[in-house]
Amino acid sequence: MVKLRLKRYGRKGQVTYRIVAMNNLSRRDGKAIEELGFYNPRTNESSLNIANIKRRIEQGAQPTNTVRYILAKANIL
């Protein structure tokens, strides 16, 4: 099953995340199928590829709770 989830980047104390489509059995920082945007929790900044996110959801991808919150805040869900 494909999930939309966060992939951790950055360094200790200055973490950013990329929103990616991944197999649910992959590791958190494992190989992603597709990168769909990023999220910076320190500044609450996010950049999303809306067309690709909608396409992935239509194909059956399930967002995690945190990604669902980010998408709802951006009025995608």
Curated annotation (Swiss-Prot):
Keyword Ribonucleoprotein in annotation: yes
Gene Ontology molecular-function annotations: structural constituent of ribosome
Gene Ontology biological process terms, A to Z: mitochondrial translation
Stored PROSITE patterns: RIBOSOMAL_S16 (PS00732)
Keywords: Cyanelle, Plastid, Ribonucleoprotein, Ribosomal protein
Keyword Transit peptide: no
One Pfam short name: Ribosomal_S16
Protein name: Small ribosomal subunit protein bS16c
Source superkingdom: Eukaryota
Xref: HAMAP family: Ribosomal_bS16 (MF_00385)
InterPro entries recorded: Ribosomal_bS16, Ribosomal_bS16_CS, Ribosomal_bS16_dom_sf
Annotated PANTHER family: 30S RIBOSOMAL PROTEIN S16 (PTHR12919), SMALL RIBOSOMAL SUBUNIT PROTEIN BS16M (PTHR12919:SF20)
UniProt similarity note: Belongs to the bacterial ribosomal protein bS16 family.
Disulfide bonds listed in the record: none
Organism for this UniProt entry: Cyanophora paradoxa
Localization in the cell: Plastid, Cyanelle
One GO cellular component term: mitochondrion
